[in-house]
Amino acid sequence: MLRRALLCACVGVMAAGAAAETTRTLRAQLSGDPAAPFVVENLAGAMTVVAGDGDAVVAVATVHADDAALADAMRFEQVRNENGVPVLRVIYPLDRERTIRYEADGGDRHHGHRHHGLEWLFGSWDGTEVKYDGHRVRVSSSSGARLFADIEVRVPRRALSATFKNHVGELSAEGIEGRILLDTGRGGITARRLKGEIKADTGSGEVLAEDVTGSFSCDTGSGECNVTGFDGTELSCDTGSGEVRIRRAKADLIVADTGSGRIVVEQADAGEFRGDTGSGGIDAELTGTRLRRVKADTGSGHVSLRIPADASFEVFADQGSGSLHCGFADATAVKDDHKTVGYRRGDGKVRIAIDTGSGGATVDPAR
């Protein structure tokens, strides 16, 4: 009964808060050539970028505020940054509001990420300080005036040179191409069906990429990096803390690096693979005929490699503790003072280097 009463009380507060909220719609259109570099920037909220039907960059912001006065103080304008690049920027009344409140609905209004979850709603996230539009401002989930903007950006269906910067909140892009930077200070990033030179950078949050072609780099201070479906030259995933998962990737080079977390690679056709984790295992399935070089390094964790059944290879392992096992029956063991430190098969075309501080290693034929 107490649990039900608490739940009803929470729902009542949420409904009351939602009823008090004022919304307003702002529209901005980029002047000048959309093929030239440009930026779209927001302080707090969710940002969605999609391909439109026209030849202009058009952004619509839905402002959410505690009252009409705050909502009316918001603007959406084109300015220039310190490098002279045009910026479509949501202008907040930061001369009088030094702390604003942003409450994402269950962690995300648009994309279904897990990494914020209910921490936003119930206040376990206590805020972050941001430099924005010449001001220092604090964005919190529990204090300050409610004030944020959810943005939808529509861009031409051709190559762009664009940065989409969302300081606090989720950022998603779908069906666009060019030289693209997706950047959040705190919030997850989703990239679907992108083409070109694509970079996703978040200080804290999960990065999810699907069906990307060209080159893709993911950098997150804390959070998972998940890539499913890649075809291009280079794929790089780097996280300070969190798992890296790559599936169905074709690339000349795949790099996966995490300070703490597992690296899992499935159905990867790569010329070269480099995996490095401070704490956590590496499990990589490397298929295809282009494979030439593998480097797997873990401070603590097991390394499991699966390579083509017909591969000629040479593998050497430097292990603080743990043993090396090879599942190729016709491979020749390389000994050092009665200890197996490597294996050789055929002409050794694929060079494999394994380094573990603590943990075993296996090299097996892929099924």
Which functions belong to the PLM regions below?
Residues 1-367:
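Intrinsically disordered, low-complexity terminal regions
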